[in-house]
Amino acid sequence: VTVIDTAVTTPIRWEAGGLRLAFEHDPDGPVRLVAIDGPEGDAASEPAGSARSAPRQPLVEVLSPAWGRVNNSYRYDGTALGAGLRLVDSTATSAGGVDRLEIVQRHEASGLVATTVLEAIAGVPAVRTTTTLRVEPGHAPLSVWAVTSLATGAVVSDAPNDVDLWWADSGWCSENRWTSRALRSPGLVAVDRTARGETSRNRLAISSLSTWSSGVANPAGAARDRRTGRTLAWQVEHNGAWAFELGEDPDWGHGGVPLEDRLFSETPFGPPRADRSRDGAYVAVLGPTDALHQWSVTLDGDTAFTTVPVSFTVAGSLDDALGRLAAQRRASRRPHAAGDALPVVFNDYMNTLEGDPTEGKLLPLIDAAARVGAEVFCIDAGWYDDTAGWWASVGDWQPSTARFPSGLPAVLDRIRAQGMVPGLWLEPEVVGLESRAARTLPDSAFLQRGGVRIVENARYLLDLRSPDARAHLDEAVDRLVDGLGVGFFKLDYNVTPGSGTDLDAPSVGAGLLEHNRALLTWLEAVLDRHPDLILENCGSGAMRSDAAMLRVLQMQSTSDQQDPLLYPMIAVGALGHILPEQAGNWAYPQPDMDDEMVVFTECTGLAGRLYQAGVLSGMDDHGLDLVADAVRVHKGTRYALAASTPRFPTGLPSWDDAWTTVAFDVADSPDTYVIAWRQAHAEAAVDLALPHLGGGDATVEQVYPAAGVGAGWTATRTAEGLRLDSGDGTGAPGARMYRVRVG
């Protein structure tokens, strides 16, 4: 237990962005975030008449080797410094459409000062929070191993027996696999832990590794009451290491005797307490930590540290909570006129040229892409390499002469002549061992350990803190944009450096965090110089799809998955943490596909930001017309999807689902767009839950493919939403897109 409530507490109340937050503090305890509610009457609000005790979890947890925890565990609650913080001041302000609450706390013995800043954008029911740590002058330096960006017992303490943790496991070509686990059994089992007067040592924990922020799991999660649906959701806004956990917080005020009251007592206390009805729970969300990521910093009079940002919200359902985080991401994005136009991009890589572009293969593909309506044509990996081994030669970014006898500029001119913006693939953060840059750049330009450059799969990794590294990249980008007229870059990131770099850093993980932040600063500077340049975020598929990168960049590749039958689960799952208008879902039709398979892969692209590929130059007129129709539909719906909240009528998808479905609830519109994919092993029909439609009448129109293409699907309005019937007794896969209009 971190804090035992005292009889007298003082509240701090803050309303912002449509949420109502309540904090408590007392003379003998730190500030605690005890309630997060929606507006009056909102389903996100705590049920009226709740008799639970206030959560005891401190607002800030700070783990230091000099102070440790008040109990023995490997959790990120119960830190001695967190328990010892006391309120100094709280200030609420508002400016530029952003409400701001600043809470300052101080730990007297160490001189630690923790300043927590919470911000909410007007009209967006979500809060972004960071905490800055410093040590007051005259106090000894303080080593820190971990500090929370968000820590609270609100929502999750309402009914710990009913709380499930939701998260999405991820991996190369298998991203966004959403799953849940109960906090108690099978999550944490009852172990009579109070027999020794100790809090639980266990927790449900999710974390990332290295610089692939979504390489192991997505940097977003939720805690949901499976009985009421009430959900607390969060996202880590960082392009590197992070962790979050959900754990128990026993209530010592009822039915139990703390360890300190047992010591030297003449009275036997017998077995552990049986009353756990007032136990609570907590959520802790962090950036990198010492135990997980080799991160630590030492605070002194000259050195402060600010945590990675975390945004959080609460809603009456998981869908609504994820939707409110989507609204937060949408409101926080860097404005970008060219990117916000949402042009249709054709990329020559996936199931097409596979990193082997040549003038002879590109020219007919360019013409075919223009015919179906593409607005950007991106030449992917290999354009700079004169051999077949493009992997280890990255880093110089000079056009190949062997691949383009007429010169790369002539190919880019052909793209422009067909009315499209030319684009190129770049992997800016790496330098291949066979490149000239590997020999000419100084060692200080690279991430390193013990004075040795880190090598991963025949590549070095640049350290974006280095002026030499940034100058190298600036020269390449400016040359390609100003000299060749490139208007789109696909930015890839296929290797990682492990825990980080110890060059000019207090710890390996701290060096990596500084590099991560320097990368974001460099990307901002690129767009400052080239405001019309569109940048796609691709990290070996979607291994770095986080809110920090997507605040700056315009588009995100959602996977490297090449099997069209496996992609829908990835595409729909991505919408749990990526905006539809940024979710670049690949569609890659092939000359040998039948109509249903062309429609299937194109529907995947339509479920977000259509990212077109495929050997279009080998398709007949009928096949090209099917693709062109999908592009036409996307152009007609892309701005609606960019104003929509994704909903999941058959639940967040699992890898082996027979049916995968998604609905786009368009703001300020009677329209909802529904896309459904049926696998070969599925039943012919499926029921979709669409409670946001209400019980009124609605018209349903199939928008893709056109009537008469493929099997005759039917869509019927039901009291719960919609019933789809594929009408196909053959068991073949299929997909359709519908518009449901209320009224």
Residue ranges of each PLM-predicted region?
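Active-site-adjacent "subsite" loops/lids of carbohydrate-active enzymes
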Residues: A341-P343, E354-P357, S400-T401, P428-R479, ...
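Acidic/aromatic-lined carbohydrate-recognition and catalytic surfaces
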Residues: D385-S435, A525-H530
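Conserved, mostly hydrophobic/aromatic
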Residues: T131, D302, F346, F377, ...
